[in-house]
């Protein structure tokens, strides 16, 4: 896990619920600090004009819903990068498109990712992308592999969520409600149809399992809930691999 601290993030997402869900998950993780929200590309530049450069983001999350063509995506990314020096642009897609992946790479983005692949791991993903030239997610890899050329051969595939196989479904649900969503034990107990004591037992066991699988060090002032959130939403570093496009036919071999 990369423990960057205080990465400033701006989120551009046309969907109100998506915008605020991403904001919420990033707020839980002290590695990231959301500095601005907007639902339009134009809103990005309007906000930048009103703020001092010291307030500008280190990372820009960009939704493509209102971007109609690959050329437009490339142009938007290029414009953002021309305005903000060294910014990391992360493109989030609903459905992966090969031509948009190439446009993101050509524009200088550091990631072209399917939202459902990223999931709860959005803060861990942003931290991980700080040291990656260009990444795609597993959903993008599956869709584009049969049709793309070798221009994406340098892309790295985003790791999936750290698995924690010992976590049962009920423990996962309790952690999701109490750690990720911030519910009290009483409210989570009502949601799951068990006693608050049982919820606390689930959480305690979940903490133990995740801590046993984690070799990272955390700041002393970080609460147990914060550490649990970071562990639950961590990436599986052992799953990192490079995108491998399909092999081209070997011209030295006789063809039928």
Indicate residue ranges for each PLM-predicted region:
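N-terminal regulatory/sensing modules of transcriptional regulators
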Residues: 1-149, 250-256
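Conserved long hydrophobic alpha-helices within structured protein cores
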Residues: 34, 38-44, 57-60, 168-169, ...
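Basic, Lys/Arg-enriched C-terminal extension of HTH/homeodomain DNA-binding domains
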Residues: 204-256
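Helix-turn-helix DNA-binding segment
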Residues: 154-200, 204
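Charged, solvent-exposed alpha-helical segments that act as regulatory interaction surfaces
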Residues: 135, 150-158, 212-216, 238-241
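Glycine-rich, flexible loop segments associated with nucleotide phosphate handling
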Residues: 55-60, 73-76, 169-170, 191, ...
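The cytosolic transmitter module of two-component sensor histidine kinases
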Residues: 122, 141, 160, 221-226
